[in-house]
Amino acid sequence: MDDSGHGERVFDLEFRAVNEELQRVRHALRNWLRDIVTDEHHAYDILLAVGEACTNSVEHGHRGDGRNLRVRATADDVQVRITIVDGGTWRVHRSLPDTDRGRGLRLMRTLVPEVNIRTSGTGTVVELATPLSA
């Protein structure tokens, strides 16, 4: 990571696709964001959006198979870009009116202005982008 304040700063973490790893990912990303995003509420929104993407990947893409996921974030003087890459299988779920499921994508789109999802036979890539300041 480049901490000089000039150029790109990078966060890169690979982890097993199991629920028990999600807390470690949130903790590591929170520490990285603390040095980059000055507005605490904006940093929390980013953290929550990434947490949703990772949780969706673990629960729906990998379904707890324990294979690896990768979170990579970059920040320059203008924005933060975060990419979550998995080798899981994308499944489209219909939202059921009386369940708590199916809100993760909507939540991500509410928290950060740019959410792009690409799926293929080899996995899913979720890209999030937001300005440094809210």
Segment roles from a protein language model:
Residues 26-51:
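Conserved short strand/loop->alpha-helix "switch" segment adjacent to the catalytic nucleotide/phosphoryl-transfer site
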Residues 20, 41-44, 67:
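Conserved catalytic/ATP-binding subdomain
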Residues 22-29, 108:
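Heptad-repeat coiled-coil signal-transmission/dimerization helices
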Residues 1-12, 16, 58-134:
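Conserved beta-strand-loop-beta-strand hairpin that lines the nucleotide-binding pocket
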Residues 52, 56:
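Conserved polar catalytic motif of the HATPase_c/GHKL fold
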